[in-house]
């Protein structure tokens, strides 16, 4: 449902940055108020990321007002905070479709708009990309400006500091804006600091500073005195020493909710040469009290009524796989004081809130540092402890070298609890857990498990925790099947699947479906129509070779089913084994195709990709008809 824009008269005048830049500065505070209200009303009707965008309204308006986008390049890190940017860049009327199938992309996306310079979704990539663009902008000589906006969480990642270190070396004209919404230094925000930002970014101060450097370059003692005096002045009111040491001219912190002061500072900084760093203080959830009070809860929201000041409770009473994992941690830690749980900034999403409170000394949130998380676990395993790394499938990609070099080569007992495996839904291409089976299956020493339901997940987590080598349990986003959970733990026999249904077909081609993971109910649904055998394979590595040989000998066609890329996945492993054994048999691999999977609900995407019950049946019938 599109909102009535007549209720937002100032915002109606700024459908594009060109229109925004034509407005007098005096109306911009009113524009920001309307934009914030529009964002709240829009997201509450459609679902999406809310708190981050509420906090970047003034910053977004100021950036588009000062910089000549899209000629100037504006890059948003991750993209959760870019909803105001989408609204101001010609996509206002499409906002009700965001994160929905065939709708607006949840993050800045190059194919969607010329204003989206970089397609994003994962954190900490913006400064590297901005640096590359800034270097090339300097070579083309058209006075193109490049700006990267990065949050205080994303900037903690090593990649961001690698980029800043390089930028300080090559010294291009670029601006990094730190959107700091943690309020850790809020006492430094105010009139004095805004005034200092004006002075330090102003042309007079900059000219004196740069001119003085040239004049005094031959007099090291005096040059050093000037440098130390400047640092002392700035150090009294700003925490920018680190960024100065990396080669940036640091300005801030400034009030990120004073749009007119932001514009003054940005106009000054636009004319400065070399790498610039602007530290902006914002409040996540700004303007909507519940989101200000609970920015984590209002980070991503379902549809809700803003007047109720609370989010609706899920009507699904079945536990999520994330909760199954979190409860396992607590139950296991009660038995094992050497259990150590590690997460790269995904406490809530991975279901670890309860564990972090009940076992704080065994809980480690390493921030957005996937590489470090994996090798931290290595050190703990070497020390004789039992580390578990809780990580999303798409983010484990960022720690792949560490998985091989620091865990698997030494055959260390580190378990990876891989959440969001398979189709994740509304976050689209950057967040689908499409590749983990493919990129792990080729690693020696790995034990890889794919549960069909929540109880199997619980027992596999226990199995992995007991295993004396690297292991992984991969499970999807969302709720379980509603099966009864066994309170006791039972280690599964490694590499053994189980038959769930046996075909009674006496004529025609006999089919066996080998299911890996939570698509098992869909396989059983299709099997009822086809009178097919179904096996819950459980283990991707090692495969249940005896079961595969048995099914190959007693069936005419084998079908593998997985919520992973077909290329290199579990089905590929089945074919490799059959070829090795000279068991030449027709095999149909069903899974994710060779493409990046777009956004949509899990149910919508399963249907579109032919992985629901009807789609599996259809694919098998088509294969048999060939």
UniProtKB/Swiss-Prot annotation:
Among InterPro entries, the record links this protein to: Dxylulose-5-P_synthase, THDP-binding, Transketo_C/PFOR_II, Transketolase-like_Pyr-bd, Transketolase_BS, Transketolase_C, Transketolase_CS
The residues listed in the UniProt record as binding thiamine diphosphate, with positions renumbered to this chain, are: 80, 121-123, 153-154, 181, 288, 370
Q: Catalysed reaction(s)? A: D-glyceraldehyde 3-phosphate + pyruvate + H(+) = 1-deoxy-D-xylulose 5-phosphate + CO2
- EC supergroup of this enzyme: transferase
Q: Which GO terms describe its biological process?
A: 1-deoxy-D-xylulose 5-phosphate biosynthetic process; isopentenyl diphosphate biosynthetic process, methylerythritol 4-phosphate pathway; terpenoid biosynthetic process; thiamine biosynthetic process
Listed A to Z, the keywords are:
Isoprene biosynthesis, Magnesium, Metal-binding, Thiamine biosynthesis, Thiamine pyrophosphate, Transferase
Required cofactors, per record? Mg(2+); thiamine diphosphate
Which pathway, metabolic or otherwise, does it act in? Metabolic intermediate biosynthesis; 1-deoxy-D-xylulose 5-phosphate biosynthesis; 1-deoxy-D-xylulose 5-phosphate from D-glyceraldehyde 3-phosphate and pyruvate: step 1/1
One Gene Ontology cellular component: cytosol
What the record notes about the co-factor is: Binds 1 Mg(2+) ion per subunit. Binds 1 thiamine pyrophosphate per subunit.
Q: Where, by residue number, does Mg(2+) bind?
A: 152, 181
Similarity remark? Belongs to the transketolase family. DXPS subfamily.
How this chain assembles, per its entry, is:
Homodimer.
| Name assigned to this protein | 1-deoxy-D-xylulose-5-phosphate synthase
Please report the organism this UniProt entry assigns to the protein.
Answer: Vibrio cholerae serotype O1 (strain ATCC 39315 / El Tor Inaba N16961)
């Amino acid at each position: 449902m599109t909102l009535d824009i007549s209720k937002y008269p100032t915002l109606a005048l700024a459908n594009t940055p060109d229109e925004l830049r034509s407005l007098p500065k005096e109306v911009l505070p009113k524009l920001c108020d309307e934009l914030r209200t529009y964002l709240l009303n829009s997201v509450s009707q459609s679902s999406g990321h809310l708190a981050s965008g509420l906090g970047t309204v003034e910053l977004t308006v100021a950036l588009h007002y000062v910089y000549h986008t899209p000629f100037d390049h504006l890059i948003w890190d991750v993209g959760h905070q870019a909803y105001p940017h989408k609204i101001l860049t010609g996509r206002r009327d499409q906002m009700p479709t965001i994160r929905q199938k065939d709708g607006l992309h949840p993050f800045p996306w190059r194919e969607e708009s010329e204003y989206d310079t970089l397609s994003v979704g994962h954190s900490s990539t913006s400064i590297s990309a901005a640096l590359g663009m800034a270097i090339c902008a300097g070579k083309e000589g058209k006075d193109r400006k490049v700006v990267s906006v990065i949050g205080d969480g994303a900037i903690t990642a090593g990649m961001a500091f690698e980029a800043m270190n390089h930028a300080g070396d090559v010294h291009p004209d670029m601006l990094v804006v730190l959107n700091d919404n943690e309020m850790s230094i809020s006492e430094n925000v105010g009139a004095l600091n805004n005034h200092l930002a004006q002075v330090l970014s102003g042309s007079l101060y900059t000219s004196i500073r740069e001119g003085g450097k040239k004049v005094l370059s031959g007099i090291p003692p005096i040059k050093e005195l000037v440098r130390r005096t400047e640092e002392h002045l700035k150090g009294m009111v700003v925490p920018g020493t680190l960024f100065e040491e990396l080669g940036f001219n640091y300005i801030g912190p400034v009030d990120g909710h004073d749009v007119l002061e932001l514009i003054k500072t940005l106009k000054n900084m636009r004319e400065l040469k070399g790498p610039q760093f602007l530290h902006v203080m914002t409040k996540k959830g700004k303007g909507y009290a519940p989101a200000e009070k609970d920015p984590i809860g209002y980070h991503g929201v379902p549809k809700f009524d803003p007047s109720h000041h609370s989010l609706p409770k899920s009507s699904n009473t079945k536990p999520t796989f994330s909760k199954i994992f979190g409860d396992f941690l607590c139950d296991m830690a009660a038995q094992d004081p050497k259990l150590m749980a590690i997460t790269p900034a995904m406490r809530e999403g991975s279901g670890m809130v309860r564990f972090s409170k009940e076992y704080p000394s065994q809980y480690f949130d390493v921030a957005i540092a996937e590489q470090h998380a994996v090798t931290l676990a290595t050190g703990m395993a070497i020390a004789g402890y039992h580390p578990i790394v809780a990580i999303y499938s798409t983010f484990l990609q960022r720690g792949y070298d560490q998985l091989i070099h620091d865990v698997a080569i030494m055959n260390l007992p580190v378990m990876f609890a891989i959440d969001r495996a398979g189709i994740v839904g509304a976050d689209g291409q950057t967040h689908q857990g499409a590749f983990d089976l493919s990129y792990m299956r080729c690693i020696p020493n790995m034990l890889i498990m794919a549960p069909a339901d929540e109880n199997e997940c619980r027992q596999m987590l226990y199995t992995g925790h007991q295993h004396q080598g690297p292991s992984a349990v991969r499970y999807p986003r969302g709720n379980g099947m509603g099966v009864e959970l066994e309170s006791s733990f039972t280690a599964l026999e490694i590499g053994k699947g189980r038959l769930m249904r046996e075909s009674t077909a006496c004529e025609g081609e006999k089919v066996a479906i080998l299911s890996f993971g939570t698509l098992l109910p869909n396989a059983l649904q299709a099997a009822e129509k086809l009178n097919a055998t179904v096996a819950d394979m459980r283990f991707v590595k090692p495969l249940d070779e005896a079961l595969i040989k048995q099914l190959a000998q007693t069936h005419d066609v084998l079908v593998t089913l997985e919520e992973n890329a077909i290329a290199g996945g579990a089905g590929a492993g089945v074919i490799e084994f059959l070829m090795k054994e000279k068991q030449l048999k027709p095999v149909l691999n069903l899974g994710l195709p060779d493409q990046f999977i777009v956004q949509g609900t899990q149910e919508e995407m399963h249907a579109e990709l032919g992985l629901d019950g009807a789609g599996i049946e259809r694919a098998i019938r088509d294969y048999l008809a060939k």
